[in-house]
Structure formats: C-alpha cells, structure tokens
Amino acid sequence: MADQSNNMIIEEVNKGLNPGTIVLLVVATLLILFFVGNYALYMYAQKTLPPRKKKPVSKKKLKREKLKQGVSAPGE
C-alpha cells in the first residue's frame, strides 16, 4: 500500500511540464530568435548598404604623421 501511494505522488509531479522549465524554454527561444534576427539584419545590411566613407584626415594630423616618419611636410 505504501508503495502505491508513493508512486502516485511521483506520477502527479511528473505530469505536465514544470513551470520553471517552460519559462526557461521561452527565454532561451527568445534569446536565440534575437541573435538570429540580429545576424540576419547584419548580413542584409552588409550586402545592401554602401560602405562608410572615411573621415577626412586633418592637415595638422598629416603634418604630425609626416614629421614622425621623418619626411618634411610640404610648405616647410
């Protein structure tokens, strides 16, 4: 008799999914969808958007770089 009552309790606990498991599955699914969506958007943007233009380098920076290399800047 004691064995049957213990088995019934265990079976009742195992019926259905644990609420914690459901929450974990939902959160994991949302995270995976988020990352897959981000990756898809990134790949789409790489194909369709034109490449970014580089910022123009200031004359002051050019002068400094040339002085570092040992080449005299023009106009000096």
Swiss-Prot record:
Coiled-coil stretches: none
GO cellular-component term (any): nucleus
Main function: DNA-binding protein that specifically recognizes a negative element (S1F) within the RPS1 promoter.
The protein, known as: DNA-binding protein S1FA1
Superkingdom in the source lineage: Eukaryota
A Pfam family annotated for this UniProt entry: S1FA
One term of GO molecular function: DNA binding
Biased composition (Basic residues): 52-66
Chief subcellular location: nucleus
Residue numbers spanned by region Disordered: 52-76
Compartment(s): Nucleus
Family, per entry: Belongs to the S1FA transcription factor family.
GO terms of biological process kind: regulation of DNA-templated transcription
Motif (Nuclear localization signal): 50-55
Record lineage: Eukaryota, Viridiplantae, Streptophyta, Embryophyta, Tracheophyta
Keywords in alphabetical order: DNA-binding, Nucleus, Repressor, Transcription, Transcription regulation
